[in-house]
Amino acid sequence: MIKLEKISKIFDVSGKKLTALDNVSLHVPKGQICGVIGASGAGKSTLIRCVNLLETPSSGAVIVDGKDLTQLKNADLVHERRHIGMIFQHFNLLTSRTVFGNIALPLELENTPKEKIHQKVNELLALVGLTDKKDAYPSNLSGGQKQRVAIARALASEPKVLLCDEATSALDPATTQSILTLLKEINRTLGITILLITHEMEVVKRICDHVAVIDKGRLIEQGSVSEIFSNPQTQLAKEFIRSTFHISLPEEYMEKLTETPRNATSWPIVKFEFTGRTVDAPVLSQASKMFGVDLSILTSQIDYAGGVKFGFVIAEMEGDDEAITRTKTYLMEHNVKVEVLGYV
């Protein structure tokens, strides 16, 4: 449905060339949700704005529903843009219009008959759960309600594609989850292809089928969510995945933790990282029995993304040096990532 082929975007800033996108290629199949994740300034917003040509690429092709938008005349481009909805971080609602009026605006601009406008807007109000707010003004809405209005407005022209530019960044965690649930439901019931950009891996984990990691204007890694979470190839992808975990040592251990053993009875505190099949395999207990090492689990967290389990365990290892070394080697050979955090 969306194909970006070797897209580059170069800005002229005070006489200097600034490359925002560098030879980016991305394919989002029909009906899928794709998330592009990256840090601030990585090129995310420029990329998504190239999809509907709010930013014109310096080179490359932007193919949406089989048509290269970069090759269309203005009138044809305007027509194709009606099939591409977009929502933003800051909602962009008209304060002088009611909820109903904001959603109706795209239909009015297309000279849609009033009767059809009323029918369509009421359907969209029901879809986003705002039927009782149709006569309210944006100033009387919460952030989540404003974003629901923006989503309904973006759907008014019955788009095939929905672009989401940091759509949940200005929302609190609970509201973010409700908006993500709504987007997932829209994707499932209407079959709309969704491309979203975010700096939060939690968003990708929650609703995406496919993920691409962008850094300094280049896509450095992409694949299904299950592939990336189970076997990330780049350091940046690994850091984003770790950011979804909120795991730390108990305070009493943090106070005693040292970089090197203090004495013969100082034991290592080790973090084990599991992905994919290793989560279900009893490798920790197997290694403990095999090498005679006692493992005292201090904290852990297991989660899912793209149908794949992943997680962390932090444990204290007690045993002689050789047994501990053999245990760590065994676990690494079984695709468990091992990191010594310190000694207590």
From Swiss-Prot:
SMART domains: AAA, NIL. One of its GO terms (molecular function) is ATP hydrolysis activity. InterPro entries: AAA+_ATPase (IPR003593), ABC_MetN_proteobac (IPR012692), ABC_transporter-like_ATP-bd (IPR003439), ABC_transporter-like_CS (IPR017871), ACT-like_dom_sf (IPR045865), MetN_ABC (IPR041701), MetN_ABC_transporter-like (IPR050086), NIL_domain (IPR018449). Its main location: membrane. It holds the Pfam family ABC_tran. CDD domains: ABC_MetN_methionine_transporter (cd03258). Keywords: Amino-acid transport, ATP-binding, Cell inner membrane, Cell membrane, Membrane, Nucleotide-binding, Translocase, Transport. It is a peripheral membrane protein. It catalyses: L-methionine(out) + ATP + H2O = L-methionine(in) + ADP + phosphate + H(+); D-methionine(out) + ATP + H2O = D-methionine(in) + ADP + phosphate + H(+). One of its GO terms (cellular component) is plasma membrane. ATP binds at residues 38-45. It is found in: Cell inner membrane. Its EC number is 7.4.2.11. Residues 2-241 form the ABC transporter domain. The complex is composed of two ATP-binding proteins (MetN), two transmembrane proteins (MetI) and a solute-binding protein (MetQ). Belongs to the ABC transporter superfamily. Methionine importer (TC 3.A.1.24) family. Part of the ABC transporter complex MetNIQ involved in methionine import. Responsible for energy coupling to the transport system. This is Methionine import ATP-binding protein MetN. It comes from Pasteurella multocida (strain Pm70).
